[in-house]
Amino acid sequence: MKKILLFAILILGIVSCNDETESTSQLPPDAKPIALTDGQAKRVGQDNGFAFDLFRKVIDFSKETNVFISPLSVSIALGMTWNGAAGETKSEMESALKMSGMSVEEINEYYRILQTTLPTIDPTTKLTLANSLWYRSGFQVKSDFLNVNIDYFDAYVRELDFSKAWAVDTINQWCAKKTNNLIPSVLDNIPEDAVMYLINAIYFKGIWRHQFEKKNTTQADFTNEAGEKVKVNMMFQKDTFAYAEDEKAQYLDMPYGNKAFSMTVILPKNGNTTADLLKYLTVDQWNSILQNLSMREVEVYFPRFSSKNKFLLNDPLIDMGMKLAFTDNADFSNIVDENLFISRVLHNTYIEVTEEGTEAAAVTVVEVGYTSVPIIPEFRVNKP
């Protein structure tokens, strides 16, 4: 059984649409909605669908006690890689990432807008999204592939001697810098067949719109999903929040800053677990929950905690339909004309929730390598 934590920037929820009065006027003005075209709005829904699917698969495959992922980070890193795919490999990636019905230009423009707009919509919240592309010295990458990652993903591109011991340190130092040192290391070594790393890093620091007072934090029991009671530092406040409940759970939306970003908490009831709810939760159901939230005074008890995770996402992504990309039959001919495949997708995360707010980070690494060289049979006629 798992105590499940989700920190995913779900784009449909980044701007509050609730205009009801809050308990104090000494608050930042609400964020202005991001202007999206119909196609970009459609892509938002697709990306959120990918987020829910990925989260469910990670829960199924992970043995971690706590599960905390950033689907946005995974989506961006795979979006960079998708530009190098071709044929059936590309089609499978589009299906897993839920990109159907959109052109290459529309998809890349969507990622560009995310990365240029999200960090600016709340001046009280720090959000950075950074991308990089590292390739082995002497590896001849097609210029179109490099250019699309520079133009749309603002990727830092560097040729690196992967055979040197300091190559790992160089990549890890970039990740550490882009996550405010919350994720200091993502790679232990670079395999001999690795030729490229496509990396996304996200850092988030948000201050609660309604902060908890430290004097109200006390030791209290917390019952995990195994039914065990453990002592935690339980924060408390009474204020006005967007809230709803049904026969399955209670729902609470706790905004940061100007409400551009928020943490929506699901508290199961009537014998349900978080895993039970998430197993069947769809984007449409999630949107319905958000629309049913209404402002009311709530007494909030919330644990202060921190958590970090490391995941290998190969199996979850394969189970989502991205099969060929991880095999010798993969087609990444838009990177080079040689035979390449995705050898690993690594995902590291960190989150800390305190009385003041939330600090979190995520790094997704897509490792691309040469496929195994096929054994050529020898037929030597040197005897009758």
Labelled PLM ranges:
Residues 60-61, 247-249, 283-286:
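Short amphipathic beta-strand starts and helix->beta connectors
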Residues 104-270, 291-376:
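Non-catalytic, conformational "gating/processing" segments within enzyme and secreted inhibitor domains
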Residues 268-294:
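Internal alpha/beta scaffold segment
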Residues 377-383:
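Short loop/turn motifs at secondary-structure junctions and domain boundaries
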Residues 93-97, 212-219, 274-284:
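Short Gly/aromatic-enriched secondary-structure transition segments
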